[in-house]
Swiss-Prot record:
STPGR repeats lie at residues 21-30, 63-73, 119-148, 157-203, 213-243, 257-268, 351-377, 400-410, 433-443. Pfam families: SHIPPO-rpt. InterPro entries: CIMAP, SHIPPO-rpt. This is Sperm-tail PG-rich repeat-containing protein 2. Signal peptide: none annotated. It comes from Homo sapiens (Human). Keywords: Repeat. Coiled coil: none annotated.
Length: 459
């Protein structure tokens, strides 16, 4: 209404139709738009585009109704290639987090995830919609997936019912000289043969520091504060009226170890084996170690009567006959000898390995402290000097029975078995060689000896 542009009425001027009426004949030719002078519709000078898209070549682009004779090339129909446009998201989701691959033609191909993936994160979760909610919440043991029983780890702490709230306080007595860790170890440590060498070397290297100053009880000072310095105490001030040494150093007692004072390095198996091998006696003949005596020595020794020879009077009178077999004291009889075959081993001060009573010694040393009796003669003297209950004088030795106190038992004589023989073991050897009295000196030697003796007397 307010437009001053010219109106074009030429579209309606066509009076007749064309010869061939078709789709392309309806296009009305448009006039070229000329620049209008300040006559802008709606006060705007911008170019207006038409709502209809007009192709440059209408006949070539789209065939009309008269183009029914289609060529052979147009009859071959090709399937159109469909290319899906892949949109790259800004936030990667579950299946689009592995990136994309761009081809040469500009197409984008999505990279697929690997077969197994152990990564975790907010973009890697794959929700399972096909599984029920009850199975997702169940956290027990699936019997189809488990290969064995589940083993619970053992904890060192106490359990729910093992707490002792009320604790009894016990007084602990600790020995300063012995460490607390060493008091519980009552097992003896015996090193091996190859460990002794190392222990001996350590003992030589790390020697204990010995102080030069003597102990409190080792001073022998005769002077006192009440007496002058020049005067010395005599025998009257010595206790018990004796000036002998009270405690002598005995090597025997030092070598004997106590219940808990074994020196493993000195009293080892090697040293004991060496001492046994050095003191081992030679093997005797026929497995016997009885000392053998000659007949001459035996006759001289048996000249005086012994304790068993006083019963000969009863045998000679025929009053009583003993049951003993004759010649029983003969050392040379094969079967009737009662002489001891082995030497009597003297009593050793050191006890045997099996004579230790570990339970008793532990109770006396750790639990109940009792008085231990002395084990040697020197220890008995030391203990007896301070005990008031010891006897001062020796007991009176009672004499033996007199001559009239004997009551001989008369028994019948037992017959001597026939197979027992009193044959001597070593018979007297007969000398076959002639003695000095069997030789006769010739007459010429006798005359020469007489002349020599006469000449010696004259001189």
């Amino acid at each position: 209404m307010y437009d001053r542009a010219p109106r074009l009425l030429k579209l309606a001027e066509g009076g007749s139709t064309e010869a061939h009426v078709g789709p392309g004949s309806y296009q009305v030719p448009f006039l070229k738009q000329q620049a209008t002078g300040s006559n802008a519709p709606f006060l705007s000078l911008t170019a207006r585009e038409s709502t209809f898209t007009i192709a440059s070549s209408i006949e070539k682009a789209v065939p009309g109704p008269g183009h029914y004779n289609v060529s052979e090339a147009q009859k071959i129909s090709r399937s159109p290639t469909l290319t899906r446009s892949v949109d790259v998201p800004s936030i990667p989701s579950c299946g689009k987090s592995y990136g994309y691959h761009i081809n040469d033609d500009g197409s984008i191909i999505k990279c697929f995830p690997p077969a197994c993936d152990s990564t975790l994160g907010p973009a890697y979760y794959k929700p399972q919609f096909d599984v029920s909610n009850a199975t997702l919440k169940y956290k027990g043991i699936h019997f189809g997936n488990s290969s064995g029983r589940q083993e619970l780890p053992k904890k060192s702490g106490p359990g729910p019912g093992q707490y002792d709230i009320v604790q009894k306080k016990t007084s602990y007595y600790e020995n300063v000289n012995i460490k607390r860790d060493q008091q519980q170890n009552y097992c003896s440590f015996i090193p091996r043969l190859y460990e002794i060498i190392v222990l001996q070397e350590k003992k030589k290297r790390f020697l204990p520091m010995k102080s030069i100053t003597p102990a409190p009880g080792t001073y022998n000072e005769p002077r006192t504060a009440l007496k002058s310095l020049k005067k010395t105490s005599g025998l009257k001030n010595i206790p018990f009226g004796q000036s002998a040494v009270r405690f002598t150093q005995d090597i025997r007692t030092e070598e004997m170890p106590g219940p808990g004072f074994y020196n493993v390095l000195n009293n080892t198996i090697i040293a004991s084996v060496r001492n046994i091998c050095s003191k081992k006696q030679k093997k005797s003949a026929f497995g016997s170690s009885v000392p053998r005596t000659f007949f001459s020595v035996q006759k001289e020794a048996c000249a005086t009567p012994g304790p068993a020879d006083y019963q000969e009077f009863w045998h000679s009178q025929g009053v009583g006959i003993s049951d003993e077999l004759p010649n029983l004291t003969n050392k040379y009889a094969a079967f009737l000898s009662r002489a001891k075959r082995t030497m009597k081993v003297p009593d050793m001060v050191i006890p045997a390995p099996g004579s230790y009573d570990v339970h008793k010694s532990y109770e006396m040393s750790q639990v109940k402290h009792k008085y231990m009796p002395p084990r040697s003669l020197v220890a008995k003297r030391k203990h007896a000097s301070f005990l008031s209950a010891t006897p001062r004088c020796l007991e009176k030795v009672t004499d033996g029975p007199g001559p009239a106190a004997y009551n001989p038992v008369l028994r019948k004589s037992c017959p001597i078995p026939l197979f027992v023989k009193a044959s001597k073991r070593f018979e007297e050897s007969k000398e076959i060689t002639p003695g000095p009295a069997t030789y006769e000196i010739s007459q010429e030697k006798k005359k020469g000896n007489l002349i020599g003796e006469m000449a010696a007397d004259i001189m």
